[in-house]
Structures are given as structure tokens and as C-alpha cells.
Amino acid sequence: MSDIFNQFQQQIYQQKILIAFSGGLDSTALLALCKKLQENRPHFQFRAIHIHHGLSPNADKWALHCENICRQFSIPLIVEKVRVDKSNGIEAGAREARYHAIANHLNIDEVLATAHHLNDQTETFLLALKRGSGVQGLSAMQKESVVFNLPIFRPLLQFTRAQLEDYVKSQKINWIEDESNEDNSYDRNFLRNIILPKMKTRWAHFDQAVYRAAQHCFEQTQLVNELLEDEFQKIFEKNDRTLSVKLFDRYSYIKQKALLRLWLARLQLAMPSQKQLEQLIRDVIFAKPDAIPQFKLANQVIRRYQQKLYLTADFADLTDVAVPLKISQTVPLPDGLGHISLREQSGCFVFSWRHYQVQLPPCKQPIEIRFAYSGKVKLHKNGVNQDIKKVWQNLNVPPWLRNRTPLIFYGDQLKSAVGFFKVFDC
């Protein structure tokens, strides 16, 4: 048992770690190894976090088990309950909820340590192969990476599950078994419980071979990215993280896809399928010049505007939204747009939204905040009536932000687009 610990401690160079602790075998092994490491390195600090997904009838028991284990070994533990959005599947929703919860607790000087091991790597590789992934997907998991903007460390990646089980048993620590691990309707469980045991009876070192293959794929991915970096920097705007596609037709189709993958990786997005990537190139990048194309990827949207690709949230349609507003009121706006307030000051109505303020003449008509208008406006005394679309274009406001800007209406008369312009009254 000293061999596994000696190998483990050689990989740990961080001073502070937050362990994702489910109470299962793998994370229990990681917890026990870190506890022993702390005995040898007094300056090494670690905590644990248990995410209560609420998906199993045993979820409360698992949380209690984790509390008992951590109390037994004097390990600080955070238990965080989350709500899982199942719209994109339970596994994806649980993963996203888990990482978002962890992000709220991970200190700036900590890394998140997960207990992924060699068998997990094999499963991840084969699942990527099943999806038809390229070398980036077949790179599977790396010892260090960034997920949801969190620094992830996987110190057990070269150990087998059997090694971890032997170690935990030697420490006489109990662990929990998730009943869903026996449900072979999940692809990962199907591989783990049915396919891989048969493969390993024929090829005993299959896991180690897959690990090497994943490393080869990772190196190829790194090499491609390194060779593309100079070209990528010419079209990547660091300030707004956009990608210029003005000269995209000069690149080969293969290079177009590689540059897009590199951009998406910089934005820390899951890689789209080959079909999705081809659709993005065809329907967004090379859409008609006057089009307003967009492409939904998971819960975000890639949009083209003025020959640049932007990544935005999947915003709600606010076309029919109208929010009444009265003097001395502060009211919430929809879809995470914050609050807008109205007060009377020195004979004017003062509207405040975010860091913007608009002063308008007082009125007795009902006041509403809307988000859509398709008529003409006049911005200056000697100006002409212009279509509002032209006004937005002259201000270089992207189409999706136009429909998220509070429009102040006195009755049915547009008075101002907060932060951008006021309408001139004749």
C-alpha cells in the first residue's frame, strides 16, 4: 500500500486543494491519500465539498455519510444542495449544477481535485470514440485542465479502481455505492459493467494502452493548436473574445474547422459535433451579408455581426414584454436585466438602469418599459426621421442587444433607449 501513496505524493505540488467528495470509493481514496499526505506535509491544506443533487432517494444518507467521514478525520467539509436542470439530460444538468456550486466555494488559491482514475479514462475515451470524436475528444481527461473556468486536478488518473479499492480497504474506511451505477441504460455503466470486463479478460493492460492513446491524441491536439496560434491571434479579439471571419474564405475548409475549434476551446465550450461545426460554417459564417445568423450550442448562442462571431447567452424573446413604471418605483426587468427606477428631481423624471441615467420631461401618461419598436425616430432638432434599425446600425449596437435595451415609453410614444439615445420632441 505504500507504493500507491509514494506515487501519489510525487504528483502533488499544490499547497491547497478542494476535494470533490461524493462518498464513493474513488473520492474516499483521494480523501484518505490527502489525509496521509497532510501528516507528512504539515503545510499541505485540503477541504472537501459534497454536492447534494437530490436525484437519489439515498441522497440525504450520502450527505450524512460524508459528514461522518470528514468529522472522523477532522477534514473541513462543505455540503451544498443544488437543483438540477434536466432539460439537456440528467447527467449534463447534474454536472453543470455541480461545477457551478463548487465555483461558489473554491478559493482563488485552491485547485479542485477530482478522483477520476485510469478506468474512468478508458470509459471517457471509448465514449468519445462512440460519438465519432476527433483527436481533441479522444484526448479524454488530462491530469490538469480547466472546466467551467475552474482549475481541475486529477491526481489519480494513472491508478486503477482496483488499486484504489485495495488502499481504502487497508485504511478500513467505508464508502457508499450509488445504486445508479448498476443501471446499464447509461452508456458509461454499460461499458463499465458489460463491455470492458470482457475486453480485459483478453487484453489485461487495455486501460494502460488507452491511456497512452489518449496522450498521443492530446499531443497531436496541442501541436495543431501551436501551429495555428499565430494565425489565430490575427483573428481573435481578446477584449470581447470575438472571432473575425472577414477573411475566412481564404482558409481551407480543414483550417476553418480547426480555427473554430480553437476559438471554442478558448471560450471553454464543449466541442460541437462535425455536423454542427459544418452547419456553423455554412449557416452562420457564410450566411448572406445582410442576414442575422445564429447557431445554438448547448445553452449558448453563436452570432455573427459585422463579420465577427460572438458568443452570447440564449436570451429570452422580450418582444411582447411591457413593464409599467411609476414615480418613486424600482421594478425588476426580465431575463436578468436588473432593475430600473424612476424618481422626480428638479422638475425632471430621472430613469436609472445599471450605470445609466436618463432625464426626461415629466408626463401624466402611463409610463412603460418595453424592448421592441419598429417605427421611426428623430434624435436632433434639425435631424430627420430615421428608421430605428438605421439608428441602431449607426450606433454599432448588435441586433441581440437592441432587443435587450430598456425603451422608455410615455403612452405609445418612444422617449428613450436607455444608455443610447433620446428621442427629440417637436
UniProtKB/Swiss-Prot annotation:
Assigned EC number: 6.3.4.19
Superkingdom: Bacteria
CDD domains: TilS_N (cd01992)
Major localisation: cytoplasm
Subcellular compartments: Cytoplasm
Broad class of enzyme this protein falls into: ligase
Secretion signal, residue range per the UniProt entry: none
Molecular functions per Gene Ontology: ATP binding; tRNA(Ile)-lysidine synthase activity
Classification via InterPro entries: Lysidine-tRNA-synth_C, Rossmann-like_a/b/a_fold, TilS/TtcA_N, tRNA_Ile_lys_synt, tRNA_Ile_lys_synt_N, tRNA_Ile_lys_synt_subst-bd
Record GO cellular component, one term: cytoplasm
Positions contributing to ATP binding: S22, G23, G24, L25, D26, S27
Catalyzed reactions: cytidine(34) in tRNA(Ile2) + L-lysine + ATP = lysidine(34) in tRNA(Ile2) + AMP + diphosphate + H(+)
Keywords recorded for this protein, A-Z: ATP-binding, Cytoplasm, Ligase, Nucleotide-binding, tRNA processing
GO biological process: tRNA modification
PANTHER family documented for this protein: TRNA(ILE)-LYSIDINE SYNTHASE-RELATED
Functional summary from the UniProt entry: Ligates lysine onto the cytidine present at position 34 of the AUA codon-specific tRNA(Ile) that contains the anticodon CAU, in an ATP-dependent manner. Cytidine is converted to lysidine, thus changing the amino acid specificity of the tRNA from methionine to isoleucine.
UniProt note: domains: The N-terminal region contains the highly conserved SGGXDS motif, predicted to be a P-loop motif involved in ATP binding.
Family in the record: Belongs to the tRNA(Ile)-lysidine synthase family.
Name of the protein in question: tRNA(Ile)-lysidine synthase
Source organism per UniProt: Mannheimia succiniciproducens (strain KCTC 0769BP / MBEL55E)
Lineage: Bacteria, Pseudomonadati, Pseudomonadota, Gammaproteobacteria, Pasteurellales
